[in-house]
């Protein structure tokens, strides 16, 4: 992949710009330390605060398990977020750190409401025999379809989701 994919990336709009000419916030370029939080609980928030106390401001907090559904299920239906999540984000930001929640940008759970409502199968990758590519992870044991990254439907969903996360939950970005 290194021999063909890396050179290919430099021919694409998203890969041919230098870091200096990309629209990357300075805080992200300056980030020295990222921590991963798993959940929205008092215990998790105490651990985040303890880490900030020790290392100081400027930490990036990469948040997982912030949504109401079990992990690796109901993608991309992340809303509503857990009720405490917005307060967690606010606390992190008041301590001069940045919060960036995780979303899965390639899987769509056929059990998600959006899969039926938006005809998720139409945006899913298919094998040569026409069947869907699917994956099951040990975190959930739920079958998910692999979504075509070139699908205009999927672009709309992911862009809308990223906008909603940043605008309604006031995060510093989305991973």
Model segments located where?
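Active-site beta-loop-alpha junctions enriched in small/polar residues
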Residues: 38-40, 64-68, 104-108
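Compositionally biased, intrinsically disordered low-complexity regions enriched in proline and serine
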Residues: 6-9, 70, 116, 134
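Short amphipathic alpha-helical segments, especially helix-boundary/capping motifs
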Residues: 22-27, 62-66, 135-139
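Carbohydrate-recognition beta-sandwich/jelly-roll modules
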Residues: 1-60, 78, 84, 91, ...
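Short, contiguous strand/loop micro-motifs
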Residues: 35, 74-76, 148-149
